[in-house]
UniProtKB/Swiss-Prot annotation:
This is Protein btn1. It is a multi-pass membrane protein. It holds the Pfam family CLN3. It comes from the Eukaryota. Its main location: endoplasmic reticulum. Keywords: Amino-acid transport, Endoplasmic reticulum, Membrane, Transmembrane, Transmembrane helix, Transport, Vacuole. It is found in: Endoplasmic reticulum membrane; Vacuole membrane. Involved in vacuolar transport and vacuole pH homeostasis. Also required for cytokinesis. InterPro entries: Battenin_disease_Cln3, Battenin_disease_Cln3_subgr, MFS_trans_sf.
Amino acid sequence: MIKLRLTKDAKVGCCFLIFGLLNNLLYVIILSAALDLVGANVSKGVVLLSNIVPSLACKLSASILHVHKFKFAKRIGFCVFMSILGMQWIAWSSSVPSKMLGVSLAAISSSFGEISFLHLSSRYHSVSLPCWSSGTGLAGLFGASSYLVMTTWFNFSVRSTLIISSFLPLFLLIMYFFVLPESESTSPSINNNYTPIESIDLRAGHVSFNFVNSLKQTFIFMQPYLLSHMFPQFLVYFSEYTINIGVAPTLLFPPEKAGFSSFRDFYPTYQTVYQIGVFLSRSSISFFTVPYLRTLAITQFIILLFTILQSALYLTSSYHFVLFLIFVEGLIGGTVYVNVYHSLQTTESSQRELAISTVGSSDSSGIFLASLVSLFLEPSLCHFQADRGRDWCALT
C-alpha cells in the first residue's frame, strides 16, 4: 500500500512539474525574445502589453464566469491549440503588429493554463503545488537560457527558435491523459456562499442581472484576500516586470566588462539570471514557507527604484552587482508567488478553486501596469543616457 502511494505521488509530482514547465515556457521565450521581436526602436513594453492584456482579461473573468466548472481535458486541449497557433503566428509574421497578435494568442493559453492547473493542483496530494511551482521556475530558467544559447551561441534564427518551441506544449496532453493518476476529488469546488450564474437567458435583462450579480459576489469574496495576498503579489509583479521590460534593456555596460561581444547580450543574460532566482525560490516551498510577503514586496519596489537610478545616473560601474540585484529580484518574485498560492491551500475546500481564480488576477494586474509604465520608461531612460554621452541603447 505504501509503495502504491509513493508511486502515485511520484507520478503526480512529475506531471505537475511538466505542467508548470510547459505552460510557462513559451511565455518566457517570448519575453526573452522581446528585443528581437520589436527591434531597438520600439519599447519592449509593447511585447509585455500584448501579452498581459489578454492574460488579465482571462484571469479577471475566471471567477466571474466560473471557469473552474469546465472539464480539464477541454481546457488543456484549448491551451495547447492556442500555444501552437500563437508561436507559429509570431514566427511567420513580418510586421510588429502581426507579431503582437501572436503574442496575445500565446498569452491566452498561458494565463488560462495557469488558472486551470492551479485548480487541478487543489484536487491532489500536497506534492502537486510545490512541483507545479518548481516547474514554472524551471520554465523561466530553461526558456531564458535556451533562447540565449540557441540565438547567441548556436546562431539559430529567431524564427527557427520559435517554430521549434511551438510544439513543446503537445506534451501537456500526453502527461494529462496517459500519466496523471485520478484525483482524490473529482467535483469542482464551489463556494457555498457564492451565488453562481445558474443559467444564461437570452433576454438582455436577465443576462445583465446575472452578470452584475456575479461580479458583485466576486468583489465581496475578494475582500479578505486584498491585503494579505493580492497587494503583495501585485506590487512584486509590478516592480519586477517594470525592471525586466522597462529598465533591464537600458542597464548596459561596456561589453568587454562582462565578457560579451555586443550590447545585445546583456538583456538575455539578465533574463537568464532572473529566472535562476525565480526557479530557486519557487522550489523552496517544499522546505520552508515565508510569511513576510508585504516586506518582500516593498523590498522589490526598492530594487526597482535603484535600477532606475542606475540606468539614469550610472551609480556603479560594477556589472556583477547589477546582475546580483537581478538575481535577488527573481528570488523575491518567486518567493511571493509560491507562498501566496501555498497559503490558499488552507482555504476551505469548497472555496479553494474560486480563491485561486480571484487572487490570480493580482499578478496580471501588476504586470499590466508595468507594461504601461515601461512603454515610456524605457525610451525615456535611453534618451536620458544619450543626452549624457551614453548612446548604448541604440547599439542593442
